[in-house]
Regions:
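Interfacial loop-to-helix junctions that mark the boundaries of transmembrane helices
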Residues: 1-6, 24-30, 60-72, 187-195, ...
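Structural signature of hydrophobic alpha-helical transmembrane segments
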Residues: 1-11, 71-74, 129-132, 187-203, ...
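Hydrophobic mid-bilayer segments of alpha-helices in multi-pass membrane transport proteins
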Residues: 8-17, 25-50, 75-81, 225, ...
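Juxtamembrane and boundary regions of transmembrane helices in multi-pass small-molecule transporters
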Residues: 24, 163-277, 451-512
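Core transmembrane alpha-helical segments of multi-pass membrane transporters/permeases
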Residues: 58-95, 114-121, 287-308, 321-385, ...
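Membrane-interfacial loop-to-helix junctions in multi-pass transporters
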Residues: 69-74, 101-115, 143-149, 326-329, ...
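Hydrophobic alpha-helical transmembrane segments of multi-pass integral membrane proteins
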Residues: 107-138, 142, 159, 366-382, ...
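Alpha-helical transmembrane segments of multi-pass membrane proteins
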Residues: 109-121, 147-163, 185-205, 400-415, ...
Length: 512
């Protein structure tokens, strides 16, 4: 391992982290600096082939445009989600949303777990592509939670199901290298990563409550939190090990929400007054359905389009992904916003005014997202080899602790790419080679990579910026990342221990 090369490859990440967390600057200011620095490295230090300036421009130009195009798609999703929140505020339906949820449970901690953890798990399976945080964070804000902690909770809620993604794509496509090599199957890959995340969802309810309410938040809520964690854990284990990757995330989220609400109704939660949600004592303007209609439409249309369109249209999934996977999710969210506006009785003029105001709020996000995604594309590019250098150097140093390192490598890949799928595809072959040279099980090692990649979404700057934009918290990314980094460290340590136990002690011959 060449330490200088390692630090130089790591430096774009350090610029982002030090700028946001160390100097407490907004991502909007830090990301262009990181982009300029990464471009300088690509033209000089990591110009390993000695290409001329003109040739380098030709190589990097497609990467720059790719980053801008992907940034536009994410901003479109942010626009759709933020428009819905602004519609609810404009019409006053937001107060009726609060009172509707309060009628199910007036305990803010129950609301936090159901909307912050279980709903994102469902949405990840229904759509993925950033939809969970983009929908759950505004929903929590609508219920009266602080925007910063709402974002952190929504991102944490999506830290486990991203290993399956929309219809299991992250595991199915991400683990294709193992399947093609005859080392594993989709079922084995899905089952083993489920054995990581079942412990993640077991502790996440406690992390969420501690993050939002502190130690006092556990008063009277421990039995419910135990039930929420254990029930989600059991459902996730069963679906991932005995049903399949395609339904694990959506099924876990839906069943867990139903079980949680049944517990609240049948057993109840002891709610101190300070954690009781007090609905405004005023006459309802809208029925529960009308007030929550944009979110109800999303819960129905996202899975309906994802599973229904490919079922009835030849090559339907390919058609959906003509402009990239995330684009169909953008369109569905925009349509749900329009349907919600019609259901709420919003005039065309009023709807246009809300959209115009929202455009002004989210447009600056394009600079941030575009810059960070261009950095990501350049670091992933074989031309610079920066990401592969980081991963291979980590692998070379750790030796027999490679299973734990695989979790860290997976997280690093997702931190850069913004997706677990991108991280899995990037590093799967490297893990196969490392497992062969070390005489270890490639299935458990890849499961650690897959689990780490899902967890890495929690701290990815791209995801943080996008989520901040949905609740008008642009510029507060450093506050969000302080919360998410602490949660990330706890779950990362757990997964690294599990990776060592599974590979070296419990399942050394799993699937072999």
């Amino acid at each position: 391992m060449d330490f200088v090369n390692f630090v130089m490859a790591l430096s774009p990440i350090l610029v982002v982290l030090v700028g946001i967390l160390g100097f407490k600057q907004s991502a909007k200011r830090v990301s262009p600096i990181a982009l300029v620095w990464t471009l300088i490295l690509a033209f000089t230090y990591f110009n390993v082939t000695g290409a001329s300036f003109a040739d380098n421009v030709k190589t990097l130009d497609p990467l720059v445009w790719k980053g801008i195009k992907e940034g536009l798609k994410i901003v479109l999703m942010v626009f759709g989600a933020f428009t819905i929140l602004n519609l609810l505020r404009e019409t006053g339906a937001i107060d009726d949303v609060k009172s509707t949820i309060a009628r199910i449970s007036d305990d803010r901690r129950v609301q936090l777990i159901v909307i912050g953890m279980m709903l994102p798990i469902f949405l990840e399976g229904a759509a993925g592509a950033g939809a969970p945080a983009a929908i759950a964070a505004p929903f929590l804000v609508a219920l009266g939670f602080d925007p910063v902690t709402s974002i952190a909770v929504a991102l944490l809620g999506d830290a486990t199901p991203a290993s399956w993604g929309g219809a299991g794509l992250t595991t199915i496509n991400g683990g294709a290298a193992l399947v093609d090599a005859g080392l594993s199957t989709v079922s084995l890959n899905a089952a083993m990563v489920g054995r990581f995340h079942m412990f993640g969802v077991l502790i996440i309810p406690f992390i969420m409550v501690g993050m939002v309410f502190g130690k006092k938040g556990f008063k009277g809520a421990v039995p419910y939190l135990c039930f929420a964690g254990v029930s989600t854990c059991v459902v996730m284990f069963f679906l991932s090990n005995f049903v399949g990757a395609e339904v694990t995330s959506m099924g876990t989220g839906l069943i867990s929400m139903l079980l949680s609400l049944a517990y609240v109704k049948l057993v109840g939660v002891r709610t101190p007054e300070e954690f009781r949600h007090h609905a405004a004592a005023q006459q309802r303007k809208y029925s529960a359905f009308r007030a929550m209609s944009p979110y109800i439409y999303m819960l129905v249309l996202l899975p309906l389009v994802r599973y229904g369109f490919p079922a009835v249209v030849p090559n339907g999934f390919a058609v959906m992904c003509t402009f990239g996977y995330i684009f169909w999710v953008d369109v569905v969210i925009l349509v749900c916003g329009m349907l919600g506006a019609a259901t709420l009785g919003v005039s065309a003029k009023q709807y246009r005014a809300v959209c115009s105001r929202t455009v002004g709020n989210v447009l600056p996000v394009l600079i941030t997202m575009g810059s960070l995604l261009i950095v990501s594309c350049i670091m992933q590019s074989p031309t610079t080899g920066m990401m592969n250098l980081l991963a291979s150097d980590i692998a070379a140093v750790v030796g027999r602790f490679y299973p734990a390192a695989a979790v860290l490598i997976g997280s690093s890949g997702a931190f850069i790419t913004g997706t677990g799928l991108g991280s899995n595809i990037m590093f799967a072959q490297m893990h196969i080679d490392a497992a062969a040279s070390l005489g270890m099980n490639p299935i458990t090692i890849f499961a650690g990579q897959n689990a780490g990649a899902s967890l890495g979404n929690l701290i990815c700057p791209n995801n943080t910026v996008a989520a901040c934009a949905t609740v008008d918290a642009i510029g507060r990314e450093n506050e969000v990342m302080k919360h998410t980094l602490r949660a990330f460290a706890i779950v990362l340590a757990l997964y690294m221990v599990l990776a060592m136990l599974y590979t070296c002690v419990l399942f050394p011959n799993y699937g072999m």
